[in-house]
């Protein structure tokens, strides 16, 4: 069934708490998987928890609005989830990108499919396990691992995707954009962020 925004918010807040509770474990995974210093990985995990705490608190604060038009007419703006969202994230900040990309999508009631980099996917898998432990229903968050030219290409070409986001190189961003455009799927690209 449909979950209310308040229920979603509570789950995401619980998820943030679980990230804090398991921060050292997830930071160790992140440091080993990416090769970054443990001190940096620890800071990244704090940021991930904050994303879910923030968007958990925002989940029931986003509403439609009524805009006066003319002669007693109003325009009603209704905010609805996209549906199924695809999130392709890079290797260099997988945990932070997990939070930055998925927290707002889940808070607004979307189902999400995460495709982490084949070079650093372990923190995303562990965080998804914690999300389930926090109460996220089965199917709300899915993790697909594999190579970009296989798993990523299949994800962006899938007709069941309603929105996509990609962070990575301009060359791959063009491929993602072309693939999603074939199905008229909106796509947000963050390219060459170095």
Task: Locate each region found by the language model.
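Residue-level signal for inorganic ion chemistry
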Residues: 8, 30, 52, 109, ...
